[in-house]
Regions:
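Nucleotide/pyrophosphate-binding catalytic subdomain
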Residues: 1-206
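An anion/pyrophosphate-binding glycine-rich loop and adjacent beta-alpha core
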Residues: 210
């Protein structure tokens, strides 16, 4: 197995968590654990993506344009995270991520750089609509990389009794992620605001060994 794929864990940080001063510290605490040797960070759009939604309502541009702007919002937030987490660094492809891991740094994937080159090569289509937000992008990257685990960092805890469709209806995940769940490997959910950073195992594919 190559250095690009060996035990890679996609770690998706909810964009709303950028508004919390403790996020850099809590994130570093989580990523320092031995079980996350090759984390690949993806940062959600948060308030920046919300601005895109507002602009679309005002200016009536199409879904594809909104998607592109929302991905650019993720890049803005990724740059912010790289600025406030000293061990993190922005990367645009697998080679740059591998270099970051070799340097004991935490790569943050610039999806605006990665997706246009990667999407034509992958069988799973990523919708360019609001049905596919940063949750879906993180899931898509997990499959495309491929990674052995997806870790969702959220502002709330998870009850394992709640089905994915209900979580999507409540706005806790997007509908694409809910629909792709059975295709994904291990998926963990972490409430980054909780007193104890304890991952909840949300999903394990039947034929996927738990790393």
């Amino acid at each position: 197995m190559s250095a690009h794929t060996s035990e890679v864990h996609v770690v998706k940080l909810g964009g709303s968590l950028l508004g919390w001063s403790e996020t850099p510290h809590r994130l570093a605490e989580l990523l320092s654990r031995a079980s996350l040797t090759r984390p690949l960070l993806i940062v959600g759009g948060g308030r920046a993506a919300d601005s895109v939604r507002d602009w679309q309502q005002i200016h009536r541009f199409d879904e594809a344009t909104a998607h592109d702007l929302a991905v650019d919002a993720m890049t803005l937030n990724s740059q912010l995270l790289a600025a406030v987490v000293p061990q993190a660094t922005l990367v645009g492809n697998r080679d740059e991520a591998a270099t970051a891991w070799q340097q004991h740094r935490w790569p943050i994937l610039d999806c605006a750089a990665f997706l246009p080159r990667e999407e034509p090569l992958q069988p799973l289509e990523l919708p360019h609509t609001w049905a596919a937000t940063s949750d879906a992008i993180a899931a898509w990257v997990t499959l495309a990389w491929p990674a052995s685990r997806l870790v969702l960092l959220k502002s709330t805890g998870l009850s394992d009794q709640i089905p994915a469709s209900q979580l999507a209806a409540a706005g806790l995940i997007d509908h694409c992620l809910a629909g792709w769940l059975e295709e994904l490997p291990t998926v963990d959910w972490v409430n980054l605001r909780a007193a104890t950073l304890q991952p909840t195992r949300w999903h394990s594919r039947a034929d996927q060994p738990v790393p």
